[in-house]
């Protein structure tokens, strides 16, 4: 799938994103609890792949920036959370150089074309003290996730790239 096709996929999903997340609220509530545990209030936080901005708004950070390569997701985030900053940006072609205490990549890795390039680009927004928090679901959940999708409890996702253990 090309980058343009991925952007279109997420642009098309932007309008229903929050309703879709509400259907899997247990998963997202657990993630939010984890993020509250590891990210102190008043930290500076960069969320890459911020979607409609719900997580960033919940973290109550002193400085927060959300990046997403989908213009429609970014517009939805700005509309829903006007007190926060959101930008259209791609981690694989990152241009910002502002440094953050925490960088969050929630359920993003599998959607990246070049994971290693993305990791290299993180050096532009991190210091040696920055904590990078990456979440992804365990592939052991795949049968249940597929069943939930077939039952209409989960929306369609892109095919994920997986990292090999070598």
Predicted segments, located by residue:
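Class I SAM-dependent methyltransferase SAM/SAH-binding core
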Residues: 51-93
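Acceptor-substrate binding/catalytic loop of class I
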Residues: 150-166
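Short catalytic micro-motifs in class I SAM-dependent methyltransferases
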Residues: 107-108
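A short glycine-rich, Lys/Arg-flanked "PGG" loop and its adjoining helix->strand segment in the class I
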Residues: 116-131
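Conserved class I S-adenosyl-L-methionine
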Residues: 1-40, 42-51, 133-155
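A conserved beta-strand element that flanks and buttresses the S-adenosyl-L-methionine
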Residues: 104
């Amino acid at each position: 799938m090309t980058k343009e096709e991925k952007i279109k996929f997420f642009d098309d999903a932007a309008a229903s994103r929050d309703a879709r997340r509400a259907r899997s609220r247990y998963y997202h509530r657990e993630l939010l609890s984890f993020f509250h545990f590891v990210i102190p209030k008043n930290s500076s936080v960069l969320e890459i792949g911020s979607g409609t901005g719900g997580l960033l708004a919940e973290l109550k950070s002193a400085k927060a920036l959300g990046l997403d390569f989908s213009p429609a997701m970014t517009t939805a985030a700005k509309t829903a959370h006007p007190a926060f900053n959101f930008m259209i940006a791609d981690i694989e072609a990152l241009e910002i150089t502002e440094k953050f205490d925490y960088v969050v990549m929630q359920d993003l890795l599998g959607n990246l074309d070049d994971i290693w390039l993305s990791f290299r680009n993180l050096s532009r927004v991190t210091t040696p003290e920055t904590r990078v928090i990456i979440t992804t679901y365990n592939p052991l959940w795949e049968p249940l996730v597929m069943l939930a999708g077939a039952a209409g409890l989960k929306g369609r996702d892109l095919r994920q790239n997986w990292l090999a253990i070598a």
